[in-house]
């Protein structure tokens, strides 16, 4: 160091010393300015520089841990294939392999603190590193625990030694893999394996959850070997609904169960509800199984369905109101009415005619356009009595004619009877008395005033008796009133002409020209 630089350094050092507060150690130093003081300052400066250089060197060339040395050695030498990584239980317990936390260099640290010393000599060659690793492997292993252990994975580049083989022999092995073409599950990177970032190797200990899972896997009992079965027996989880439906169909005995499904149920276990899903089955085999089961159920004979019994036939016979337990179907219908009623000249009506006449007037149940005016379609006042109506009315007349009319000989008549105003014509036996007419017409439930008007319209003799034509016209007017027609002021001659025919003889009508 030349004089110029030395003088500059002395001046700087003198300035820093002047700025620094005086301490206890500087009390014994000689006064500045003398030769002795300059020598002391130079010696102190050189000592301080040496300490700073040694500190920088220790901070820059910090000894690397053995893991970094092993990683550097792995990069230099080709990797040796290792079949299975071996876990050592006591490897982390050695103080040599524990990774020391780097102590950050602090420029403000006091100079009197002890300096860190390197653990390993960084100039050691590869043989020294291998020897160190072998020494660590030769540590005694005393019954490593299964559930709680601190494993440290061996680097993949280190050769396999007989000690490692003995340790791996004592480790319990997992059960053998199942047969059935199961796909290998990709191994997830465990925390115990070394992770290399940027050429450096770091070790991370296993967590409690990982150790518990490992212990549970090792404590699980071995499963029995599955018998040889076709690959169709495996059922993917995507088609479980179809197979469950097929299984329910076999329970109902509607179709024989598929042999593929039965075989899969036998292989899976005694319980038919538990289906073993294997992810190793391809989609083609599963589709073949579904098609086979559907064909088997389709070709199976369906259950015989017997038709329901026919309903019992209804009895056409009508039950009597007086005798509800007896039916009139067995006894033939009598052509004559009951004995309490008087016989008429009219024969009993047939059932077919009554039904035809009943349906004749009820063709249109729903009236179309009820408020529309149909002048030409409406039924006008009837100008004549039909043959059917005349026969019905003549039957009532024949049953009631001559009632309550006294019949006496002319010789037996007294003078008082001859002089009386009450005299009947000789044909009174063919007429109906007014009392009988009132009793018959009152059954129509028409007002007495309407019945009186009808009597006045048909009573042409004014003797209290009605002939056959008068009685028939009166009955016809009652029916017209019940149908809604108004009573005429005078009965037209066409109505009288229609009822003048001989009873029982039909006179054909002459067409008008």
From Swiss-Prot:
CDD domains: EH. Residues 1-383 are annotated as: Disordered. Disulfide bonds: none annotated. GO terms for cellular component: cytoplasm. It comes from the Eukaryota. GO terms for biological process: lipid metabolic process. Residues 67-77, 296-305, 327-340 have a biased composition (Low complexity). Gene3D superfamilies: EF-hand. Residues 412-502 form the EH domain. Residues 90-103, 199-211 have a biased composition (Polar residues). The keyword Lipid metabolism applies. The keyword Lipid metabolism applies. Residues 359-373 have a biased composition (Basic residues). Keywords: Lipid metabolism. Residues 1-23, 128-140, 217-228, 237-248, 374-383 have a biased composition (Basic and acidic residues). Belongs to the IRS4 family. Positive regulator of phosphatidylinositol 4,5-bisphosphate turnover and negatively regulates signaling through the cell integrity pathway. Involved in rDNA silencing. PANTHER family: AT21416P, EH DOMAIN. This is Increased rDNA silencing protein 4. It comes from Neosartorya fischeri (strain ATCC 1020 / DSM 3700 / CBS 544.65 / FGSC A1164 / JCM 1740 / NRRL 181 / WB 181) (Aspergillus fischerianus).
């Amino acid at each position: 160091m030349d004089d110029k630089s030395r003088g500059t350094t002395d001046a700087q050092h003198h300035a820093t010393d002047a700025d620094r507060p005086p301490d206890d150690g500087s009390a014994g130093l000689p006064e500045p300015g003398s030769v002795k003081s300059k020598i002391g300052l130079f010696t102190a400066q050189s000592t301080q520089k040496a300490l700073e250089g040694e500190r920088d060197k220790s901070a820059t060339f910090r000894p690397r841990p053995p893991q970094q040395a092993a990683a550097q050695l792995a990069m230099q030498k080709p990797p040796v294939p290792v079949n299975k990584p071996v876990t050592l239980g006591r490897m982390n317990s050695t103080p040599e392999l524990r990774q020391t936390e780097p102590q950050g260099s602090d420029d403000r640290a006091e100079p009197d603190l002890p300096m860190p010393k390197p653990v390993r000599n960084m100039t050691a060659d590869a043989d020294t590193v291998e020897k160190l690793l072998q020494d660590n492997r030769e540590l005694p292993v005393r019954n490593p625990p299964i559930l709680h252990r601190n494993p440290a994975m061996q680097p993949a580049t280190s050769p396999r030694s007989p000690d490692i083989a003995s340790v791996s022999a004592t480790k319990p092995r997992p059960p053998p893999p199942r047969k059935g073409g199961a796909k290998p599950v990709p191994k997830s990177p465990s925390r115990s394996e070394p992770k290399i970032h940027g050429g450096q190797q770091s070790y991370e200990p296993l967590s409690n959850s990982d150790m518990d899972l490992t212990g549970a896997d090792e404590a699980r009992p071995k499963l029995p070997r599955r018998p040889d079965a076709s690959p169709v027996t495996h059922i993917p989880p995507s088609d479980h609904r179809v197979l469950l439906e097929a299984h329910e169909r076999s329970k109902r005995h509607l179709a024989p169960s598929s042999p593929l499904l039965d075989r899969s149920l036998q292989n899976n276990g005694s319980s038919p509800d538990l289906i073993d899903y294997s992810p190793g089955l391809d989609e083609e085999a599963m589709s073949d199984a579904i098609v086979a089961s559907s064909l088997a159920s389709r070709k199976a004979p369906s259950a015989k369905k017997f038709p329901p019994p026919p309903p019992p036939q209804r009895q056409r016979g009508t039950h009597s109101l007086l005798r509800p337990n007896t039916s009139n179907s067995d006894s033939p219908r009598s052509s004559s009415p009951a004995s309490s009623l008087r016989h008429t000249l009219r024969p009993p009506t047939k059932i077919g005619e009554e039904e035809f006449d009943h349906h004749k007037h009820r063709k249109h149940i729903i009236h179309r356009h009820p408020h529309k005016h149909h002048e030409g379609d409406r039924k006008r006042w009837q100008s004549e009595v039909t043959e059917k109506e005349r026969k019905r009315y003549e039957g009532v007349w024949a049953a009631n004619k001559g009632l309550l009319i006294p019949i006496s000989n002319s010789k037996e008549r007294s003078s008082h009877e001859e002089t009386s105003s009450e005299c009947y014509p000789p044909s009174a036996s063919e007429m109906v008395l007014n009392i009988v007419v009132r009793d018959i017409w009152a059954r129509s439930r028409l007002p007495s005033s309407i019945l009186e008007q009808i009597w006045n319209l048909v009573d042409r003799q004014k003797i209290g008796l009605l002939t056959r034509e008068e009685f028939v016209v009166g009955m016809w007017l009652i029916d017209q009133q019940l149908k809604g027609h108004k009573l005429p002021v005078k009965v037209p001659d066409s109505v009288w002409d229609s009822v003048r025919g001989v009873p029982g003889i039909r006179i054909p009508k002459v067409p008008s020209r």
